[in-house]
Structures are given as structure tokens and as C-alpha cells.
Amino acid sequence: MLIILVMFLLGIILGFIGAGGAGFVIALLTLLFHIPIHTALGTSLAGMAFTSLSGAYSHYREGNIQMKIGLIVGGFAAVGSFFGAKLTSFIPADLLHYLTAGMLFLSAILILIRLFILKEKAQVNQSTLSTYTRAVILGIAAGVLSGTFGIGSAPFIQIGLMIMLNLSIRHSVGTTMLVIIPLAVGGGIGYITEGFVDYVLLVKVLVGTMCGAYVGAKFTNLMPKVVLKSAIFLTPAIAGLLLLF
């Protein structure tokens, strides 16, 4: 019951900033509840397949998704994530703590770049062979990162969609939500085959975070933008710090 309560409180924060928060889930599961890091990674990533559905549907209705690009990136991300999950079993638990923390710090830096530095670029034709090739590369790279370290890689995907595929910020955010679904499914299957998904824990995490996110989303439009942007940046940074303890 305590796990559900903690995940509910975390869900409020994640709903407020509009993030999947896999890194924070991993940090809390390992630090507070002493869940083995491999199980925390697998359970967290598998859970994202469910939590991303509602967000992707909402963005689809708002016209924020480049469907063809999203399906290509997502399809190859699923493959990369599956093999990334397999790779995790060869990484010692102590080392995995530090590697995942490092990825979260890098994620925070990329978020900082996206929110405060990166400028909007005009969108170009998305139907060239070169575009599809870059989409495949982005999908595989993001998938391997997510599968190996159990995080959603949303900042990596968003930055990649903007820089490599010239998507607008709005379309990069929406398309990322679509990409994360097959990515999480592929990684989740990989972790399941390695025995790193705790189904009871998965249900507790989902119940807590999804209920909390519903509440937290109601506060998003009530806060000043500077508070929201700061929270989006600080969330993975704090999660990375927690993993170091």
C-alpha cells in the first residue's frame, strides 16, 4: 500500500510536468523500497507502455503526431529496446545504478537545451529516403538507450525529431508519445524474457502513478511557465542524484 501512495504522490508531479518519469520511478523503487535495480528498470519500462497510451491518444486528437515518422521511429525503437533489455542482464547492478544516473543527468541537460536554447525550425518534406533513414537510426538508438537503462528517453527522442527530422516542437512532443508505446512494449518483452518484471509491483506502480497523474495534470495550467520549465528540468536531475545513494 505504501508503494501505491508514494507512486500516487510521484504521479501528481509527473502529471503536472507531463513526463513519463521512469527515472524517478526507478530511483524511488531502489532507494525507498530496495527493489533490485534490474527489476526496477524492467517494471518501470513495461509500465510506460500503458501510461503513454492516453497521452498519445490526446496528442493524436490534437493533430500533434506525424504518424508515418512516429511509426517508423517507434517500430525500430521497439527492436532496439528489446535488445537493450537483453544487454542489461550483462551489466552488474552497482554499475547499472551509475550508468542510469548518468543517463538521467544527460536527459536533464537535453531538456534544458530543448526548453531554453533550441529554436523552432521550419518543417520540411517528410517523405524522402534520407528522412526515413534518419528515422530508422533515431529509432534504434533511442530504443537501445531505453531498453538498457529502463528510461523512456523522451528528451533524446524529442531532440532527435527536431534536429534530425526537422519536426516542430509541438509535433516532436506528440510524436514522441507515440514512439514510446512500441518502445516500451519491446523493452518490456525483453525484460520479461530475462525475468526482470514484477507483475504485482507493476500493478502498484500503474495504479499509483496513473491516478496521481490525473490529479497533477489539473495544475499544469495554473503555474507560471518558469515554474513548469524548472520542474521539467529538475525531475530527471533529482532522480539521477537519488540513484547515486
UniProtKB/Swiss-Prot annotation:
GO cellular component, one term: plasma membrane
Keywords: Cell membrane, Membrane, Transmembrane, Transmembrane helix, Transport
Keyword Isomerase carried by entry: no
Transmembrane segments: 1-21, 34-56, 71-91, 98-118, 137-157, 177-197, 199-219, 225-245
Pfam families: TauE (PF01925)
Residues making up the signal peptide according to the UniProt record: none
Chief location category: membrane
Location of the protein in the cell: Cell membrane
Membrane topology according to the record: Multi-pass membrane protein
Similarity remark: Belongs to the 4-toluene sulfonate uptake permease (TSUP) (TC 2.A.102) family.
Name assigned to this protein: Probable membrane transporter protein YdhB
